[in-house]
Amino acid sequence: LSQNISSLISKNLFERILVHRNDRACGAKGFYTYEAFITATKTFAAFGTTGDTNTRNKEIAAFLAQTSHETTGGWATAPDGPYSWGYCYNREQGSPGDYCASSQQWPCAPGKKYFGRGPIQISYNYNYGAAGSAIGVNLLNNPDLVANDAVVSFKTALWFWMTAQQPKPSAHDVITGRWSPSVADSAPGRVPGFGVITNIINGGMECNSGSNALMDNRIGFYRRYCQILGVDPGNNLDCANQRPFG
């Protein structure tokens, strides 16, 4: 199945999409490799292998776009445009806090911080715990692995992408057309498309408030990547009029 992924996204395409990630200005330069991405996808066999070629390409574009927004080093007048600077960082910038929430199932380890790391910027002990359990790595005790081991890093992002967290569907099911909105979803405007994936990831901050720069940045990456991969981005790209999930 991993062969299917590499037949859709070659190393050459990967380099074109994430063209500036190894720029000297990028904190994660040298970290995110094509080989680590392909290796990580083997753990999540349905990723990029579900549906027809068009659907599969759209999923790859959507995943790389959402994660590029989370890790971008781009700015408005950046060389090759702001959407050529995804995967510039692998840890939250600034002085992030502990991101420790009370949890019986996934208690924080002493002295460990669970700030954003990796392509999806996984945050909080309960996400590190659940992701680590799913991929067979103790991330509660070793959260820095997500910024030190590129395969583990990609796996945490793929885990988030492939896993539904109630009441939200998985991003995978949305982009592959497997999610049908319930009445409770349709009334608040949550319809299939790239926009509802933004809602899944960060709806409370970015959705149901008209146009905003964060939401538009995600769409910008997605349009560029769809163009490179030769697919139509589809409808419902924004979440401007979608209420966040409960």
From Swiss-Prot:
Localization per Swiss-Prot or TrEMBL: Secreted, Extracellular space
Position of the signal peptide: none
Annotated EC: 3.2.1.14
UniProt cross-references to CDD domains, sorted A to Z: chitinase_GH19
Domain of life: Eukaryota
Catalytic reaction list: Random endo-hydrolysis of N-acetyl-beta-D-glucosaminide (1->4)-beta-linkages in chitin and chitodextrins
MF terms in GO: chitinase activity; endochitinase activity
Gene3D superfamilies: 1.10.530.10, Endochitinase, domain 2
Pfam family, one: Glyco_hydro_19
InterPro entries: Glyco_hydro_19, Glyco_hydro_19_cat, Lysozyme-like_dom_sf
Gene Ontology CC: extracellular region
Residues of the active site: 70 (proton donor)
Cystine connections: 26-88, 100-108, 207-239
Keywords, in A-Z order: Carbohydrate metabolism, Chitin degradation, Disulfide bond, Glycosidase, Hydrolase, Plant defense, Polysaccharide degradation, Secreted
GO BP terms: cell wall macromolecule catabolic process; chitin catabolic process; defense response; polysaccharide catabolic process
PROSITE patterns: CHITINASE_19_1, CHITINASE_19_2
Keyword presence, Disulfide bond: yes
Keyword tRNA-binding: no
Gene induction: By fungal infection.
UniProt enzyme class: hydrolase
Function: Defense against chitin-containing fungal pathogens.
Family: Belongs to the glycosyl hydrolase 19 family. Chitinase class I subfamily.
Protein's name according to its UniProt entry: Basic endochitinase
Organism per entry: Solanum lycopersicum
